[in-house]
Amino acid sequence: MRIGLINVNGATPINELIQQVVQADKDGFDHFWFAHLPFNGYDALMSVSMAGQQTNRIELGTAVVPTYPRHPLILAQQALTTQVLAGGRLALGMGVSHKPVVENAMGLSYHRPAQQMREYLSIVRTLINDGQVDFNGELFNVKGVLDVPGSSPFPILVAALGPLMLRIAGELGDGTITWMVGQKTLESHIVPRINAAAESAGRPQPRVCVALPIAVTDDLAAAREYVARVYKRYGELTNYRRVLDIEGVAGPADVAVLGNEEQVERHLHALAEAGMTDFLAAICPIGDDPAASVARTWAFLKSLKRKT
């Protein structure tokens, strides 16, 4: 199990955010991920570029860049440029986002999202590996050359929760990034589907990067209240609601990793046994002293990382 952090707070100032990455690099975490939120916060790829200039070792990921607003040729160029600036440590997470975001906010058509991702990923993968593409599909016709000096290929992970997206992630990608997915859903739905798809395509076993809210705390009630309040909207979006229903739970508080050190460690090991390869910790500030709460969770994850 690889352990890292994810920032899902769009209000975090950029200098503070970069300092978190610098500290995570020093503390030995495997990766740090930047959420790309639709309505607030910083651009994920630009954040990776900036963090890459100030860190030495840690993998830097996007979770996740939306595909509909960007032509695949443009995203490939942006990502290859970011790979150069990040010193070859980029992990590109991308996804189709959600119908209300794409159609209501952006004014675009959320047309055939699975086919859009299949073709989009095929184009981007070919461009980063070969530097050129000649693709004729049902949704995209792309012919172009891309030369980004000093760049190199990087892993591409797909935000995949449904059967079609999991098949695409396994057949064409390097893994998936999940959010609000619990142990039961990992074991019965996510992992079997993506692993079977990768095996059928002759690809290596995919990464299963599981992002969840986490708090090491003795006040479980306060932690559950925080997660239920702050992450309420995720329980209302169709894609997340489906996996919460598969899990058989009411909302985000029921899949969050909460409790004291012993309880949280057991929870993380259970997720790993269910097939999680990477944990992306969205640390929650709980109680009257948020800084102390975050520090306790960070220290626990740091110590757990040393044991793995």
Regions found by a protein language model. Name each.
Residues M1-T308:
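Active-site-adjacent structural elements that line small-molecule/cofactor binding pockets in enzymes
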